């Protein structure tokens, strides 16, 4: 009886525990036939011939090949799983790698950047200068508009002239001529004529008017003075 050198278990037809694909396939068909016939028929009244041995061998070889493929696939899967378990990129990437790079809870001190500091300090100073310049530019037209719209707050450079002309207007409307000292201290208008009392004819008529002496001339002179006063206030 020939023993297969590559079989791990010796095939014994009388012992079912030794039935294995590798042990049966390790025998040649002739050796298998001799082994089966020597140990007795597996079925009563039936002897194993070459056809049975060939079928057994073919089935054994196919089963052995299938078992080898299964083992190969299992070993491949096992090796892949072991490689995945022992691969440092598989285990360290979600733990050390992510903690080292993407964990927001870890706050690291960063050195100060001079360009960022200059960029931050620059805009804090410039808007103050531009704001003061804008305020000064806006205050001047506002003061001019305010002084031109309301006669109660005239600009400082036209205070004396406007006050003197207001005195002329008040004295002309009331019928009394202003005093000589007040006329000398104030600025006389350039286009109008000195006021005259109501009911008293003027000695010299205005050079620009051809109307006779009377109320119309007085009214025109008063309106001219008031117009000069309004012009002085608008300046």
Curated annotation (Swiss-Prot):
Family annotation (InterPro entries): Herpes_UL35 (IPR007584)
Keyword ATP-binding: no
Subcellular location: Virion; Host nucleus
Region (Disordered): 104-235
Record flagged with keyword Chloroplast: no
Keywords: Capsid protein, Host nucleus, Virion
Compositional bias per record (Polar residues), positions renumbered to this chain: 127-139, 220-235
Signal peptide range in chain numbering: none
Composition-biased stretches (Low complexity): 158-188
One GO CC annotation: viral capsid
Function noted in UniProt: Participates in the assembly of the infectious particles by decorating the outer surface of the capsid shell and thus forming a layer between the capsid and the tegument. Complexes composed of the capsid protein VP5 and VP26 assemble together in the host cytoplasm and are translocated to the nucleus, where they accumulate and participate in capsid assembly. Participates in the assembly of the infectious particles by decorating the outer surface of the capsid shell and thus forming a layer between the capsid and the tegument. Complexes composed of the major capsid protein and small capsomere-interacting protein/SCP assemble together in the host cytoplasm and are translocated to the nucleus, where they accumulate and participate in capsid assembly.
Record note on quaternary structure: Interacts with the major capsid protein/MCP.
Family statement drawn from the similarity comment of this UniProt entry: Belongs to the herpesviridae small capsomere-interacting protein family.
UniProt protein name: Small capsomere-interacting protein
Organism this protein belongs to: Varicella-zoster virus (strain Dumas) (HHV-3)
Lineage start: Viruses, Duplodnaviria, Heunggongvirae, Peploviricota, Herviviricetes
Gene name linked to the record: SCP
